Curated annotation (Swiss-Prot):
Any one of the GO CC terms: plasma membrane-derived thylakoid membrane
Protein name in UniProt: NAD(P)H-quinone oxidoreductase subunit I
Molecular-function GO term, any one: NADH dehydrogenase (ubiquinone) activity
Binding site for [4Fe-4S] cluster 2: 74, 104, 107, 110
Pfam families found in the cross-reference section: Fer4_7
Organism of this sequence: Prochlorococcus marinus subsp. pastoris (strain CCMP1986 / NIES-2087 / MED4)
Protein task: NDH-1 shuttles electrons from an unknown electron donor, via FMN and iron-sulfur (Fe-S) centers, to quinones in the respiratory and/or the photosynthetic chain. The immediate electron acceptor for the enzyme in this species is believed to be plastoquinone. Couples the redox reaction to proton translocation, and thus conserves the redox energy in a proton gradient.
E.C. code: 7.1.1.-
Entry's cofactor comment: Binds 2 [4Fe-4S] clusters per subunit.
Enzyme class (EC, first level): translocase
UniProt gene name: ndhI
Family from the record: Belongs to the complex I 23 kDa subunit family.
GO biological process: photosynthesis, light reaction
Keyword Zinc-finger among record annotations: no
NCBIfam families tied to this protein: ndhI, NuoI, PRK05888.1-3
Amino acid sequence: MKDFLQKVNSYIKEAFSAGKYLYDGFTVTFDHLRRRPVTVQYPYEKLIPSERYRGRIHYEFDKCIACEVCVRVCPINLPVVDWVMNKETKKKELRNYSIDFGVCIFCGNCVEYCPTNCLSMTEEYELATFDRHNLNFDNIALGRLPTNVTTDPSVKPLRELAYLPKGVMDPHEVPPSDVRVGKLPEEVYDWMKPKLNDIKNPTVEPNK
């Protein structure tokens, strides 16, 4: 009788443990079911980065005084400042400035400590390339302004996803019935179809 009761007790404990594990698993599953989808049909849809996003560095050649503060504060001594000393004026003359974004960790120290504010962080994050050497930007490439997603006709910027609604701290509190993050390819095509027709069949007004 004692052995039988021990077996029953062991069976009850195992059943209780299995039920607990099932409950924990279904809790995670149903929690994910309540979340909003996060799919974005890139590159037809792009998220607008947050206000303090640390993207590609923008550089203004005319403001730079070749002080090399950016090199000293960089954790990996990345910026390359090429300058010569003008013996007549006894001042530095900047010749070239470059940053290799294949090595950069985007910490923002160079931007923070620049005395002339010639460096700034942009929201540009599309730096993919087939050759890593193309990620070494010189002063000309660094001086180009980043492309604006909101003015690109081939891209639908998701403005409503840049920030959470006012007063909402947890993204799980946003109901699933709100605006979807991503759209299906056919929905993207339907949205772009009128614009594609305008490109294929442009309207030409006769000369008066």
